[in-house]
Amino acid sequence: MRIEEDLKLGFKDVLIRPKRSTLKSRSDVELAREYRFKHSGWQWSGVPLIAANMDTVGTFSMARVLAGFDVLTAVHKHYSVEQWQSFVSSVGEETLRHVMVSTGTSEADFIKLRQILALSPSLKFICIDVANGYSEHFVDFLRRARDVCPDKVICAGNVVTGEMVEELILSGADIVKVGIGPGSVCTTRVKTGVGYPQLSAVIECADAAHGLGGQIVSDGGCTMPGDVAKAFGGGADFVMLGGMLAAHAECEGRIVEEQGRKMMLFYGMSSASAMNRHVGGVADYRAAEGKTVSLPLRGPVENTVRDILGGLRSACTYVGASRLKELTKRTTFIRVAEQENRVFGRAD
């Protein structure tokens, strides 16, 4: 046993210090990024936000809308091959290039992944997703996927430390997914005592990934557009959003009525709700590590996306970054004791 004394920070612990700017308008800010990925060699450009691969966020309906904003969707792994086939035949190449195909790490998952990828050469992204990216089995699956799919962009996670980021990149990942426990409906930290404050994880993991020519995605912990800006400021190449995109018309979630008001259920993918739906319940040997909440219906997701993109542009103007690419270099974080004035409640 040992204790690390260094202070680790989450998004709520900091603000971004404003700096002199020559920008005249938020409209002058370019949010698109361009990446050439280490292993696949594929070059991609777009707005580096990703809808999370949760079954009430990473949906086909979400992918159709977000592609119009040049934003990615990690489509959840619970669609059948037949459902994928129907989706692929109903959308164009431009939508498919904004889609990540999510997979677990079982043999059945591997077979299904190959069947889905065979549907269209425009499906370029793979998202290998497990709660604990530190397992040897996970790394072996990643190596196998890289061998079979040399031209695909592989995003793999989740991890929170630099040495494991390096391990995954050297094993075939182009992008490493960073975050253990920060999600709005994740209870891993309270059930297990395991985790890492998200901003510090992003800063440390980005440093490790960039040293090897890889990228990271900050997954979890964003509750408002300012948190997204902080993630990019901390060095994230992509930011994945779950709760911020939940309960919209495109989420395909279950709608319930509470006190005469229509609500949508939103739950973590390790919650009892998710396991009851997809694997027949919580196994005897494990605990659920997610919770279920009911959220007011929020209408079309496009309004929320515009709000997030607007917040990002505004953050860039406050520090003089004409492009999102410049935000990290222009960011100085200051530690704070409070984030906002809540005399009239929390901001939306």
UniProtKB/Swiss-Prot annotation:
- The organism's place on the tree of life at top rank: Bacteria
Residues the entry annotates as binding NADP(+): 108-131, 216-239
Query: What is the organism of origin for this protein?
Result: Edwardsiella ictaluri (strain 93-146)
Against HAMAP family, the record matches this protein to: GMP_reduct_type1
Q: Which reaction does it catalyse?
A: IMP + NH4(+) + NADP(+) = GMP + NADPH + 2 H(+)
Family as reported in the entry's similarity comment: Belongs to the IMPDH/GMPR family. GuaC type 1 subfamily.
> Which SMART domains does the UniProt record give?
IMPDH
Q: Which GO terms describe its molecular function?
A: GMP reductase activity; metal ion binding
UniProt binding sites for K(+): 181, 183
A GO cellular component annotated for this chain's UniProt record is: cytosol
Q: Which residues does the entry assign to the active site, renumbered to this chain?
A: 186
The protein depicted here goes by the name GMP reductase
What's an example Gene Ontology biological process for this entry? purine nucleotide metabolic process
Claim: NADP is one of the keywords in the record? yes
